[in-house]
Amino acid sequence: MRSKGRARKLATNNECVYGNYPEIPLEEMPDADGVASTPSLNIQEPCSPATSSEAFTPKEGSPYKAPIYIPDDIPIPAEFELRESNMPGAGLGIWTKRKIEVGEKFGPYVGEQRSNLKDPSYGWEILDEFYNVKFCIDASQPDVGSWLKYIRFAGCYDQHNLVACQINDQIFYRVVADIAPGEELLLFMKSEDYPHETMAPDIHEERQYRCEDCDQLFESKAELADHQKFPCSTPHSAFSMVEEDFQQKLESENDLQEIHTIQECKECDQVFPDLQSLEKHMLSHTEEREYKCDQCPKAFNWKSNLIRHQMSHDSGKHYECENCAKVFTDPSNLQRHIRSQHVGARAHACPECGKTFATSSGLKQHKHIHSSVKPFICEVCHKSYTQFSNLCRHKRMHADCRTQIKCKDCGQMFSTTSSLNKHRRFCEGKNHFAAGGFFGQGISLPGTPAMDKTSMVNMSHANPGLADYFGANRHPAGLTFPTAPGFSFSFPGLFPSGLYHRPPLIPASSPVKGLSSTEQTNKSQSPLMTHPQILPATQDILKALSKHPSVGDNKPVELQPERSSEERPFEKISDQSESSDLDDVSTPSGSDLETTSGSDLESDIESDKEKFKENGKMFKDKVSPLQNLASINNKKEYSNHSIFSPSLEEQTAVSGAVNDSIKAIASIAEKYFGSTGLVGLQDKKVGALPYPSMFPLPFFPAFSQSMYPFPDRDLRSLPLKMEPQSPGEVKKLQKGSSESPFDLTTKRKDEKPLTPVPSKPPVTPATSQDQPLDLSMGSRSRASGTKLTEPRKNHVFGGKKGSNVESRPASDGSLQHARPTPFFMDPIYRVEKRKLTDPLEALKEKYLRPSPGFLFHPQMSAIENMAEKLESFSALKPEASELLQSVPSMFNFRAPPNALPENLLRKGKERYTCRYCGKIFPRSANLTRHLRTHTGEQPYRCKYCDRSFSISSNLQRHVRNIHNKEKPFKCHLCDRCFGQQTNLDRHLKKHENGNMSGTATSSPHSELESTGAILDDKEDAYFTEIRNFIGNSNHGSQSPRNVEERMNGSHFKDEKALVTSQNSDLLDDEEVEDEVLLDEEDEDNDITGKTGKEPVTSNLHEGNPEDDYEETSALEMSCKTSPVRYKEEEYKSGLSALDHIRHFTDSLKMRKMEDNQYSEAELSSFSTSHVPEELKQPLHRKSKSQAYAMMLSLSDKESLHSTSHSSSNVWHSMARAAAESSAIQSISHV
């Protein structure tokens, strides 16, 4: 059966006959779902038997069988009789002898259970709850079945009085009209398999007319009107299809006679003389009205039944309403149903799959899934996607699909340039020590012509051996020092290869190995090569670096001389080898985030070219003196136990003390004005390092970048290494803090301070990388580079640092030749190197930073970096100080790698590594969050739009910006509000470009907090100290003229050019809510944890540093250790004068910590009331620049070195000064 039918009680007089079947009252009869149902008389659609037969489609009035002989084993109840039926050709039928009332039930229908029916006239199909055929009840055999199988079907729909229904896999006949004695029992014409009321609520696509009394639906208004003619409780209300006047005329014979003459067909308007003729005609219309299945022979009177039947053929294409139990085969009907019946529901249904959406845009986006066009294709596996987000997810989850672009440093593969750039921020490589970072053009030593980028490219071709190994590193012509040191002693295992492969230091094709035997013989006989670039001991360090035995001990390295200036114009096209392409320029910082594009960087490079060509003219006439001095050096021999000859070791290092005077002046200025003034005063950082500058000032022009190749790796302890923060979190650090990078004293919430809080502000080393100059030009990527390093610095120099470092035991003889592991080549310590995150700084390192010779070689800087780490570790771990031994060499090595504490090395190795991409994380929580980028897990779901995120901060930002429409960041200049700090910063840069205000990158909450009185006091104290210092140092003689020129001219010119170049590329300040980009950035925040959200503390009022400075100013002026707490230790420790200079500048910088909480904008504004606020900072910057020029012009009049000294004497005097504690005299002695 095709219904969950309901049955009435059996007739009482049939109880003896059908005693085996218990009486089931209709009110208690459960339906197929087991729920008791109530009687309903609105029954329309009993169905014909055996409608599943494929060979037979029953037609009303068709003959089934001839009259048969009734066997004795099929008894008929006494109140019924078997005689010829009124239905034409139907044979015998059942007639009643008594009145049968509505609601009585007969049954069940008895027969054999079969899988199919032999004779469709004598059987029924039993259906399950999903309307699938379970089995058939077949009563076609003469001796099988009950008397119910002789009940015939009515010829037309108004003659029936019984309907069939299924109850628990049994068929019953129910009376739906009163049957008078002598009437035949007739089933509903073409009776459907289930009653109308059980079928209609599930499927009736076009029945949109509802009865308000019984909630029954009809296909047309006419049907509803017919239904409403009778009360809903009467049996004919559901089936009355006859006109009211027709039923009234049936009551009288006269009317019947009239009807016989005027019978009219309602379907085709034909008129018949009598009712019988009309009924015969109606049979033809009934046949035409059948709804036949186009996939099987079944036919139905109701379209809804046909639809339900067709669902069994294609079960995968029915669309269910999400708000009710109705099912539709056409999604348009489902959509119409939802709009009409369910107000406010998702009314937009997909025509392909039926999925509904609340908006048409959501449906349009969803339709792309069914589209055959998939434009987003994976480059590796060529799998295509209709949406870009799906392609990104695919690449995250499949590591193999990210291997397209190879990292030049570590060999790791990536699928996109942006992912490669992001990786390069964390990767060790040549771009951390790019050519300009060590031999920047325009930075010419005395006697060295300034070079543009083209000439440096020429040198790259001239020296392929070193160029292949160190990438873009070049050696400028005219330098009197080698690219590798003149080591007469060597470190056999000084530079292990590490985990990442590098090409051989001197490839087989290199001119080093390609020298002829004659050339080798000649060069081995001479201590020096013919070109002044090379010193004789170059071969030793090359052997130590490369560890290639093929380079013989007696084979010096030959580097081809610089090509003539005539060749340069023809090789300008080789600029691309200077990493001017997008990948090479941007990758050192991973600047794929916002503002810096390849064209931006190229424009910077081009502008730098023109600038350096002009600056280079002023040094060309200085070439010959230095070359002559270099030729004198070529005659010197070197011992195996000292770098320099004994005669040179006897000289005094006068130039070292003069360097100290310049450093002191820079420290005074830096203390008051941050690091904005003479940003790159090259010796500014030396005081914070364990050694002084190795070269006198005549070698160093004044540029805005530090001389040293390790400004990014400030002194900080190993246990505090962290991954770089994302720009988003960096901005949180900026908020409420000053623009000076030195007050970022945040520490992680879950970490305790490793040292006691000192009574005075910790001495924080200044970094030329982290300068406000960079901040004022950068985007989020630049800001991240500037703010990353500082939170860890103050942990390094705690209150106990001085005693721990200076009271080290005497050096052990076994450690005389230290062999430190270059940390930057060990992936465990790669975090310390991941700080070149600024494309601007990468360019400045390449093209603006001078790097004299081997001292600033990348690997040697790594050695010094190791020494800094060990000293820092000694300050934090007193028990480890005994391992830090001092070696009397120019490099001041501390300890061999095997002497490192085991817990120190284990600290890095216990990091957590991603098994998909190999990234290393300091904590398991960071690794867990990072793994979500590979697995696609997004546990944080938005409660408003069901969008999910892998990081909770992304969800919070999404809710704040998209749903809550919050804009908490307000510009204090124009009152414009923004949803993100980065957008506000970009907007503030636009103000700065228009000279509206100098609040480029500082947070708006940190602006304009200082008072004019404080600034005036600082101005007076600043110039007073400069005058006092210059007065003390005026006893010296004059310095070379070219230093003053470079100090006063080229520095400010270059800085201005850089600012102009970068400001021209700033983005528009329109707020971009690009959540995809922010998500990628926050994936990188996994490395740093929650450091971006930690509070910023200030050391402003700790220990009253101003009083301390006034008390110790006399000591500072004589280059002695300034803090009182260091005074006793310096005589006990026996450290060299290098440490004296370091502590001197440290004490100066301690004073600077007092001012760190004031941003640059605050410190650079006048207190005068008549100057507009917008003009204060530009005017004050100009005044500071003039003050610096005056200061340096006066200080440069001191005698730095006698002109008769050779450049080699300079080298030897410096080395002697670095090795012997008594070599450097105070400024008062100069």
Curated annotation (Swiss-Prot):
Pfam families: PRDM2_PR (PF21549), zf-C2H2 (PF00096), zf-C2H2_6 (PF13912). Residues 755-764 have a biased composition (Pro residues). Its EC number is 2.1.1.367. There is a cross-link at residues 99, 190, 249, 292, 367, 374, 430, 523, 543, 547, 555, 622, 635, 663, 685, 721, 731-732, 735, 749, 752, 760, 787, 800-801, 835, 844, 846, 877, 1018, 1053, 1056, 1120, 1127, 1132, 1149, 1152, 1176, 1184 (Glycyl lysine isopeptide (Lys-Gly) (interchain with G-Cter in SUMO2)). It catalyses: L-lysyl(9)-[histone H3] + S-adenosyl-L-methionine = N(6)-methyl-L-lysyl(9)-[histone H3] + S-adenosyl-L-homocysteine + H(+). GO terms for molecular function: DNA binding; DNA-binding transcription activator activity, RNA polymerase II-specific; DNA-binding transcription factor activity; histone H3 methyltransferase activity; histone H3K9 methyltransferase activity; histone H3K9 monomethyltransferase activity; histone H3K9me2 methyltransferase activity; protein homodimerization activity. It is an enzyme of class 2 (transferase). The keyword Transferase applies. This is Histone-lysine N-methyltransferase MECOM.
